[in-house]
Structure formats: structure tokens, C-alpha cells
Amino acid sequence: MLAQVIVSGLAMGAIYALVALGHAFVWKTMNIVNFAAGEFVTFSAFIFVATFINGFNLNFLLAAFFAAAVMAALGAAFSRIVFARLQNQRVFVAIISTVGFGLFLKELARIIYGPQPLYYDGPFGQGAVSLGGVMITYQQILIFGVAITIMVGQYLVLRYSMLGKVMRATALDRETAALMGIPVNAVLAGTFAYACVLAAIAGILMAPLFFVTTEMGTLVGLKGFVAMIIGGFGSIPGAILGGLLLGFSENTAAFLISATYKDAIAFLVLLIFLVIRPEGLIPEANADRA
């Protein structure tokens, strides 16, 4: 039974890790925290289920692609229209703008899709496979597969591609990058759009696990932020490890103690890390040398 709980926790941790990756990217490149991440999770789940699955009767892959594309467009538009005008202001001004945009997305979802929760059975229904006596649902396998693919692909792009070099140069010094001819505003917009795509994928993968509601992404966005702090503020490998650790910790502790305290446990883990290891599991400086 405990093994089953651990697998479920790691699957949820992989979702937290995707959101945490978006937080880490935005922080490293734009020096802000995107507190709208949870609402991007929510809005993408609504668009995916209500518009593309139920409305247009698209298959899972096409619906996921279009939902992610809509989130990317929203993220890029926010960066070019709002953040580009605020980047010379104090940091908290840009951060507050993400809070406002998140509230806008949540209310927009409520207006368009209504207050009633939506149910989506997923592409595999309730199908599962037994591995060593542990039942793993096909949806959990999909979550692990998508998360691993994204993480490996992201590492290869950042490490070996010209796009990765451009993004790293922009993250290190925007002014120098601009002098070198790098279109900094376009890179920033692309970074924010990518973070929104990661949040969208998290929402799409979550949709079959829970009812789709206007509140479904709020805690996920916060826990993604917590995962990034646990892993090391701005550390990309740390964000992955922090997400998995957070999912494992909250699910296992909820099983051993009480599910009532599941969310509280996640933030208790954060407090413990802030006291014992405030720099996180993999500090950003160490991650950059990796």
C-alpha cells in the first residue's frame, strides 16, 4: 500500500516539477516570480477539456497541442505588452502584475465556462498496469513519460543549442546580450511563454486526476514555487528534484498521518528547508556549473 502511495506522490511531484521549472526559468531570465502560474494551470485545463475535447471533439494530442499553444500566446502577449513596459520598474511591480493577470485568468475561466466543475476521464480511462504488485495507472505513466521527455529535451536544448546559448546569455546580462544583437525582449517573451506552456501541460496532465475547477491550479502554482525554493531558488535541476521530493513527502506523510494535513505538510517541508538548508538542495551557482 505504501508503494502505491509513493508512486502517486511521485506522479504529483512530476507535475509540481513542471510548474517549478517554469518558475525557475522565469526567475533566472526575467528576475521575477510568476504568481499567475497556478491560474495558467487552471485556464489550460478548462480550455483543454471544455473547448477542445468537449467542444471540438478533438483527440487528446490535438487538444493538448492547441491548449498549450493558447497558453503560450497568452504568456508571450503578457510579456510583450505588460512586462516589457515594467522591466525598468521595481521588481515587485512586475510581480504584482502577474498576480493581477492570474486573477484575470481565473475570473475569465469562471465567466466563460461557469462555476460548475468539469469531469474528464482522460485518454486511458481508469486503465492501469501492475508492476511488482503496485498498480500504476496509464495516466501516471503518461505523466512520468511527458515529464521526463520535457526535462531531457530542455537540458539538451539549453546545453547544446544556439537557442540555449541565447537564453543563457540573456539570463546572465540583458544589457550585454542586447549589445551583442540578441533580441532581448523576444527572448523574455519566449521564456515566459515557455513557462506558461509548462503550466499548461501540468494542467492537462492533472485534468483526469481531479475535477476541473477554477481553484484547481491555485495550490499547484504555489507548490511549484515551494518546490523551486526547496530545490534552490532559480536552480533548474533543483526545481525538478524539489517537485519530486514535495510530491513524495506530502503524499507519504498524508498516508502515515492524515490526508487532512496534506497541503499543510507541503508548506511544513518548506519551513524545514528554510531553517535547515535555505539555499536549497541544489543552489543555483552549483547548478550552473553542472
Locations of the language-model features?
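Alpha-helical transmembrane segments within multi-pass membrane transporters and channels
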Residues: 23, 57-101, 108, 241-246, ...
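Hydrophobic core segments of alpha-helical transmembrane domains in multi-pass membrane transport
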Residues: 45-50, 68-74, 101-108, 146-154, ...
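Membrane-interfacial amphipathic/re-entrant helices at transmembrane-helix boundaries
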Residues: 1-19, 47, 57-63, 89-94, ...
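Transmembrane helix-bundle core of multi-pass membrane transporters
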Residues: 85-160, 187, 252, 257, ...
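Transmembrane alpha-helical segments in multi-pass inner-membrane proteins
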Residues: 16, 20-22, 58-68, 189-199, ...
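Helix-loop-helix "hairpin" substructures at the membrane interface of multi-pass membrane proteins
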Residues: 12, 135-213, 236-242
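Membrane-embedded helix boundary and interhelical linker motif in transport proteins
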Residues: 7, 29-77, 81, 256
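Residues that define the loop-to-transmembrane-helix transition and helix capping
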Residues: 2, 36, 61-62, 92-93, ...
